[in-house]
């Protein structure tokens, strides 16, 4: 099992939305590196839900990958802000995964706290200016995060 960190703005789609929905398609990713990370995911992988563009930003919950290799439907919808006119149903450019809500941690682990606990090599999200919305989390770092965050 691998671990990931996946960012979303809480007012757009936060951990509360996922808790209510139970599962969600993680769609709208329009960065090739983030897309390729999603393509590397496997069923059963876990992902830390990170609230970005929040005060403060940080890890709030845990998700599990339940489906992989899905075509992102938003790329074909002209009314969707993630519409991609260059993407065609016979040759889609963008993928997504389905995630299941696992739990919400009792307290947010802020970016500032993460920077105090982890180096850039241990947890890439602490790199200044890192805007990538999906990042791998090394197993040793995931273990430490779970210890710091406690049960959810």
Language model regions located:
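Residues in well-ordered beta-strands of folded domains
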Residues: 7, 27, 66, 100, ...
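A broad, low-specificity signal marking well-ordered, structured residues that form hydrophobic/aromatic
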Residues: 3-4, 24, 97, 132-135
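Aromatic- and Lys/Arg-enriched surface recognition patch
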Residues: 62-128, 132
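Short, charged beta-turn/beta-strand-edge "cap" motif at the junction between a beta-strand
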Residues: 50-57
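Short, ligand-facing micro-motifs at secondary-structure edges
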Residues: 16, 58-64
């Amino acid at each position: 099992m691998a671990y990931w960190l996946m960012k979303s703005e809480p007012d757009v789609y936060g951990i509360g939305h996922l808790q209510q929905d139970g599962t969600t398609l993680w769609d709208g990713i329009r960065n090739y590196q983030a897309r390729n990370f999603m393509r590397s995911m496997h069923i059963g992988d876990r992902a830390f839900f990170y609230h970005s563009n929040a005060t403060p930003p940080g890890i709030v919950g845990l998700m599990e990958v339940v489906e992989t290799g899905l075509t992102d439907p938003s790329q074909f919808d002209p009314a969707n802000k993630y519409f991609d006119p260059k993407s065609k149903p016979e040759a889609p450019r963008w993928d997504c995964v389905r995630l299941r809500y696992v739990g919400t941690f009792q307290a947010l682990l802020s970016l500032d706290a993460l920077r105090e606990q982890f180096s850039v090599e241990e947890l890439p999200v602490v790199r200044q200016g890192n805007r990538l919305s999906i990042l791998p989390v090394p197993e040793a770092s995931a273990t430490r995060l779970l210890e710091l965050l406690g049960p959810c």
